[in-house]
């Protein structure tokens, strides 16, 4: 049946604390009404008028101070909810509005009771999401609806409580096959929970008695590094430090910097499995780390975020804590005395780091060694380094090691695009601190006009450009070797960056070797103006050298 995935959605909302559901009769919403009613645990109410139904649900939520489900069919039905939704938003009353909808193939073709219900209530809801039917063979067929329910519930109870819209396109047959066992499918072994602020103190015993792993992503919170280092020391937990977390500025025994390389080893992945995982900030860039997290599907996954934002694409989060990092870290008072799990990570880290350091002997032009050279020349400076997306942030993830330093690494990892890098770097440069942009050729071409403002306002920036003549990242991905690979993905352009530098008024230098890079970098970082240091590399050679230096041997 096309709508059986909704049974876990109904079950999850009840597990989270929803107890009431209000319906208005309709055909497209048949499955929702029947599944809520058949569940037998909800107090359900039917109101023939959608406007009245919405205010009725508002009254229940207002009295009980908890979210109430409000269901309507497709078409104009949702429009009748609007007055109550505006009241709920301004009064901060939590409602979860489920708008049944026609599927995509019936949109914009004159189908009856059909209009565009995307973000139908505009700014009057805290959150909007489409709950599409997952592919039947998808691994997350039963878990995905539960995660949508969790996001809806948390958004309704955010710091400013309010209504949430979940739009649900439904296909025929509309009458569901009612199987009681479907309600239980996709349930986590560890039921989803959420906590606020000081409630996190209840984690003391659970975290101290388990193999705990800390994931540190990009985060702008004050005292972020200090708080996580303190927490790691209490828990004896390794910190997998994304370069944008800036925890690699601390040569701490708790900080791991080479995990993306050694997590390619299957034996290690099994041996390093965690029982509790703590996520702070954005999910780290490492794809292998995300694959490792998915393997730990029986671990307690605790996400700590002041806004209750959902930042785990592996869909394994079991606990969300609404707290800043410092408050959570300070709530863990006891000290773990067991170093065994930490020592396993330290052993793998040390072995992998020794292998990665061998790149210092490489004489061919290779991004890995140039990153290490860049770190060496930046170490003594109170500098800022913006890293572009695609391969450059991954090069930093692999090759930037932990050491005591003041270099602040930044990146646009919100939506991970390759545009706007020069403009962002020049905005960062307005602080007056030494500023460096590490970018690739395609990223730089996307924002050449951004250099104009740097000339206009006489800003200082050193650009380190890895030019491999096209999309080098695709040589590391599944597209490598497909028909028309160069034309469709690698996209060699053959452009002359010296000419582009002359056009935009940059001070230009083509780097000839590693020693030349060091000399030119030391000069440019101390001189005013915008400087471009171009490093030409070969995509195929870089791929071969990457495999050579990142291989973890048992």
UniProtKB/Swiss-Prot annotation:
The keyword Metal-binding applies. Homodimer. Keywords: Magnesium, Manganese, Menaquinone biosynthesis, Metal-binding, Thiamine pyrophosphate, Transferase. Its cofactor is Mg(2+); Mn(2+); thiamine diphosphate. GO terms for biological process: menaquinone biosynthetic process. Belongs to the TPP enzyme family. MenD subfamily. Pathway: Quinol/quinone metabolism; 1,4-dihydroxy-2-naphthoate biosynthesis; 1,4-dihydroxy-2-naphthoate from chorismate: step 2/7; Quinol/quinone metabolism; menaquinone biosynthesis. It catalyses: isochorismate + 2-oxoglutarate + H(+) = 5-enolpyruvoyl-6-hydroxy-2-succinyl-cyclohex-3-ene-1-carboxylate + CO2. It comes from Lactococcus lactis subsp. cremoris (strain MG1363). The gene is menD. This is 2-succinyl-5-enolpyruvyl-6-hydroxy-3-cyclohexene-1-carboxylate synthase. Pfam families: TPP_enzyme_C, TPP_enzyme_M_2, TPP_enzyme_N. SUPFAM superfamilies: DHS-like NAD/FAD-binding domain, Thiamin diphosphate-binding fold (THDP-binding). Binds 1 thiamine pyrophosphate per subunit. Catalyzes the thiamine diphosphate-dependent decarboxylation of 2-oxoglutarate and the subsequent addition of the resulting succinic semialdehyde-thiamine pyrophosphate anion to isochorismate to yield 2-succinyl-5-enolpyruvyl-6-hydroxy-3-cyclohexene-1-carboxylate (SEPHCHC). Its EC number is 2.2.1.9. InterPro entries: DHS-like_NAD/FAD-binding_dom, MenaQ_synth_MenD, MenD_middle, THDP-binding, Thiamin_PyroP_enz_TPP-bd_dom, TPP_enzyme_TPP-bd. GO terms for molecular function: 2-succinyl-5-enolpyruvyl-6-hydroxy-3-cyclohexene-1-carboxylic-acid synthase activity; magnesium ion binding; manganese ion binding; thiamine pyrophosphate binding. HAMAP family: MenD.
